[in-house]
Amino acid sequence: MATRMTLEGIYTPLITPFHADGSFDLDSLADLVERLIGAGVHGLISGGSTGENYAETVEERLELARFITERAKGRLPVIVGTGAMRTPDSIALAEGARAMGADAILLGTPPYSVPTEAENAQNALAIDRAASLPIILYNYPARMGVEMGREFLDLVSVSTNVIGIKESSGDINRLHLLTQHYPQIQTSCGMDDQALEFFAWGAQSWICAGSNFLPGEHIALYEACALRGDFTTGRRIMAAMLPLMAVLEQGGKFIQCVKHGVEVTGINAGPMRPPLTGLNADEKAALEAVITTLTAEVAAILAEDSAQGRPAAAARV
């Protein structure tokens, strides 16, 4: 049995910076890790879809995870994504995560195969046995094709390693189900435009790709809601962030936007691996305008809170 892990704060699913030839830009990845640690995020995730895991081999994903784990060791927990179409690949990633000293694994449904809930649970428990690490489930039916429903949750709950779930369904009723009927599984927000609602229902963590380039603003929302219970300030910060979430979620170029956001901070993110391509000039300009407005609005909210004597964390970069 793995040591119980508490999910609190902002967890960043890291992008993968590439050179022009498609090879890993590990220097830029190191810069990003250091920037995020300095900004105060609470954990890092390697090998998620934001990191373009679908375009990387198992060996490449393990190389990245090992690099991130070694870089962050002792400073932040590192969670390794194990999602893959083939169960043996997920097991190899889970075994690798354990061997490198990762703190936990992120475990999703194998895409495309559309397993039953019982089959999906059997798959998850096989990966659990290989990892013997804390597990954060990843429910994203829009991408995986299958919901992690009540039958699945009941079956995997036999393992005390299952400590959390990244809930990305977008269905608010799922949040109600998880918090009311599965309190032993910590619920983490995985749908950015519902972060406020997740915190209102007691979630203590948020796995958010936008924190790759706006960590301070995401931390500010978490601290206002989850730490201080100040949902008045939280609503104002959330309102300022919604235009960014609309660009990320509705534009059809989620990862491209996140990578360009990192570029705006001065860190190379590099090209996308096929089949995806980068943003055009107009799309870049539109994203940059949203970022500029968002950062100014959140800074003003935090400054007002500070002037009125309310505790508020500065939106760090």
Language model regions located:
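General structural feature for long, well-ordered alpha-helical segments within catalytic domains
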Residues: D25-S28, L32, E60, L64, ...
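Catalytic cores of TIM-barrel enzymes
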Residues: A2-T6, L177, V262, V317
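Structured C-terminal cap/extension of enzyme domains
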Residues: L196-V317
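Active-site beta->alpha loop and helix N-cap motifs at the rims of alpha/beta catalytic domains
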Residues: T3-G145, D154, I301
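Gly/Ser/Thr-rich beta-alpha loop segments that engage phosphate groups in nucleotides
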Residues: Y11, T50-N53, G83-M85, K166, ...
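Catalytic alpha/beta core domains of metabolic enzymes, predominantly
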Residues: A126-A130, P141-E249
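Residues at alpha-helix boundaries and short interhelical turns
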Residues: G40, A72, L76, C189, ...
